[in-house]
């Protein structure tokens, strides 16, 4: 294969059969269970990268069911999202995500910088209760419950929240283990068709796990819960802050990730 062909066809790996297709990435009947809770402010500050800023010690634990997504298929994900501000604009920073489908893991990490790991989240309705669970291997690390459609939510407020910017810390290493890319990425949800949104009573329990440390942001108080169903497009992102300025060498001196023999 000629190198011009490589350049012309390069999108994702493997070159001849990428793990995920070119977008746009449209999601239909995307269902959210979002529980907002109060946590330890000192611990939260230690996990949110500058120049993002915190206003309140809040975390949103999300379970998202995606039965119909372009190129990514039918899957579920879960994770922690932190309300932040960036240059005076309110938004959300994605701290961690866990899902059960390889294409959105690969695409999410490589394109946007989503902090995705392989795990087993679920979101389902059990009689009168919306139930979200997250297992890492055989170990349960999160369980959420919410009364099913107890109260209609303010749709205009929900639309406004879905329109806010979202932020990711994208990290791609160089072949020697030093950071090749270390950027703050902003992305938005577009063409949102909000099908419904509801509030209700909720609970959230987290358990410690070495590789899925969601419990390091403990639940001190459940503040609110939201159940949302929408169609939307996940737009591509843009870089809003570079942690490795162009004036600095990308192979940072004094730092090594050489493998031990």
Swiss-Prot record:
Report the InterPro entries cross-referenced here: Acetoacetate_decarboxylase (IPR010451), Acetoacetate_decarboxylase_bac (IPR023653), ADC_dom_sf (IPR023375)
Gene3D superfamilies, alphabetically? Acetoacetate decarboxylase-like (2.40.400.10)
EC annotation from Swiss-Prot or TrEMBL: 4.1.1.4
Q: Where is the active site?
A: 116
**Catalysed reactions, semicolon-separated:** acetoacetate + H(+) = acetone + CO2
Which keywords describe this protein according to UniProt?
Answer: Decarboxylase, Lyase, Schiff base
Q: What class of enzyme is it?
A: lyase
Q: What protein is this chain from?
A: Acetoacetate decarboxylase 2
Higher taxonomy: Bacteria, Pseudomonadati, Pseudomonadota, Alphaproteobacteria, Hyphomicrobiales
